[in-house]
């Protein structure tokens, strides 16, 4: 809606008023309104008889065109110019069309324009065109009826029906043998294809503002009940694949010789902005083909064509964030913008006229949004609209959000030092924030460093002091090179087989045997913490001797690199094997793998001091060429003396999918946390899937730690194995079996 500003000069109001009187004198009221995509009321045009002759109407029409030219030539006021062009030109184009079609019909006067709205509210008008044909060839009756004096007026949808004739009078005996049962006229195919169609005249003038949105076709006839299904293929002006319809069949008992009317079928490929080859205001054709060898008789075809507005699409708005206090240009990126429309942007209740740039871009200027005393941020919905006649608008696309910063844009500062004060305040604020951020950073680093340095102390059972700690817990990276030192000249590094955030793993040789080499670099202070963990891993592994523990061979100092030499496992991790569909795993092999893991963990839990792995998962279980599984990656492991009546108060570690609920809750825990992780590994072995697949980490932590979520064991898994899994991941750690018991139960299966 365009509202006339009270500040327009009086001579411009006079021109508008004269223009209004001129239109009223024509005795003619023409308007059209687009109401969105509505199947029943999409487009409406109407005309009313006038007592004046067609020649006088034509003269008035010419005068109206001359008046537009004068206003364009003057062009002293942009608002006045927009009102005149948007309001008159579409109406004059449609008026010319209606005068041509109704040159023998008298017209009556109807005055509905309102001067305050400047004739921008259009009246709905409803008409109807219905044409029919009775020839098997393309009929011209539709074209004649649409241009005849007695032709009905235009309606929102165009409907026509055609009766098929010209086919064979007797079809195959199994179908269409009694054509008089269902209709007088029909087309019947036997073993060859047929084509039939109609030419119809489209009554909608090509204004570019509304297009064909939908075509619904209904077929009536008798169809063979024997497969294959017949297929009707519809074309609109040669556009292929406009519609494919599979004919529904009825059984002979239900419909031995009857007329069947399909449910209406909609052509699926009609674009929201119409068919490319469709000719508005001119002749069009629809063809129906039957290509199958099945027998079918078509008696009647009805097509219903629905029109609607051109629907442009907005995909994004730039900028879409704040601050915005008015005056900024906002660009809307989308599709199907067209120049003949008047694009409007509504910022809340404030309207801003849009600017057409091209078919994919338009812009609007943000109006001043805040009141002079406003101190609260305001949110505004930006709605893109298309106004066809300047007064009736309809929403076409998404509502966008623009945040307007709290400010007072209309009050000019009185102090000459206003900007200087602002700069000082902003500068001080930024400096304070930087100081706080740097302080927080160093505090966090200090806490992390202290926690890692004292990690072994926190890993002890409650009540154990420093004197009771094992010497292995006091290891740092400075003693790493004293653990089974290897001379660099004995090592040949070959191919990289793995990479982490702080280290890389290579294959290589040492004294003629193939080994795995973990290579780490000490680049800065932060890496020192990682190397302390690496030293702890090497210290623990150097003391372990078991067939199911990955063998530690030694360390090598090659500044700035540190090398840890380990036993090479050619098949890689258990995780890789379980997720490789080309590797077949039968029950004996799966049981053997589970038993290997249980034996290795039982050895760790029987050590003195006991070793808690804390990160047991399929990624940290390596497999040799004989499918023997060995436990590795002890970077998060810890050792403490046995106090079976105490629980540890250790920092939560591990991977959430495999971590026990008490660890996720940051509760004290024991070596039974490893038993829970083992249960998840058993589930991986029998399912060969990822636990809690698709769930985000935070949801796993909450669901497992608080709501007792567990993976689902497949029903095909044997009862003893299922029972072992469920006991191992019991909520109560005391209910979980020890690895010594697990080994016995697996050996008995």
Swiss-Prot record:
One Pfam family of this chain: TIG
Residues where ATP binds? 497-505, 518
Instruction: List all topological domains (Cytoplasmic).
Output: 445-749
Its transmembrane ranges are 424-444
Assigned EC number? 2.7.11.1
Write out the entry's keywords from A to Z: ATP-binding, Glycoprotein, Kinase, Membrane, Nucleotide-binding, Serine/threonine-protein kinase, Signal, Transferase, Transmembrane, Transmembrane helix
Q: Name one GO molecular function term.
A: protein tyrosine kinase activity
What is the membrane topology noted in the UniProt record heading this document? Answer: Single-pass type I membrane protein
**Residues modified by glycosylation:** 157, 189, 283, 358, 373, 381, 397
Q: Which InterPro entries match?
A: Ig-like_fold, Ig_E-set, IPT_dom, Kinase-like_dom_sf, Prot_kinase_dom, Ser-Thr/Tyr_kinase_cat_dom, Ser/Thr_kinase_AS, Ser/Thr_Kinases-Pseudokinases
Q: Where is the signal peptide?
A: 1-31
Q: Which domain of life is it from?
A: Eukaryota
Name the SUPFAM superfamilies on file: E set domains, Protein kinase-like (PK-like)
UniProt entry tagged with the keyword Kinase: yes
Q: Where in the cell is it found?
A: Membrane
GO CC terms, sorted: cytoplasm; phagocytic vesicle membrane; phagolysosome
List the biased-composition ranges (Low complexity): 130-139
Q: Where is this region: Disordered?
A: 124-153
Q: Where is the Protein kinase domain?
A: 491-749
Q: Which PANTHER family match?
A: MIXED LINEAGE KINASE DOMAIN-LIKE PROTEIN, SERINE/THREONINE-PROTEIN KINASE TNNI3K-RELATED
Recorded family membership? Belongs to the protein kinase superfamily. TKL Ser/Thr protein kinase family.
The protein's name: Probable serine/threonine-protein kinase drkC
In which organism is this protein found?
A: Dictyostelium discoideum (Social amoeba)
